[in-house]
């Protein structure tokens, strides 16, 4: 790793560092759950493998394929990309527009957006099928943690937009 890449890391021992690495951990946890649930839904679109076949009639979909794709892409791969961006801070041309608009790192913006999307996903889930499984409560706590850590002043400061040179 180059010296400039090392300088982009926030020290673990600092309060900001612990909050930032906590955000990264919460995103990885979200990704693991999204990949697990999404792959299970795609493997068995009836939902029986997850014990969710009884709620399928309550949903506006014929099977769990579409929710499975959503979970894999939005709640699986996207949080991994955001966590990578927060940890490594790559400078990619395609992320410059997001950084200009938000004034923060694209990865921070993605983490905040994922926390909001997860909150909406859980609200819709709660409306349609209720909160029946413990993992829904764990996921709700994770959504709150992602939002709280992303909005923490130190994390926001650490993720401020860097001038590209």
Regions inferred by a protein language model and the residue ranges of each:
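Topology signature of small-to-medium multi-pass alpha-helical membrane proteins
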Residues: 2-165
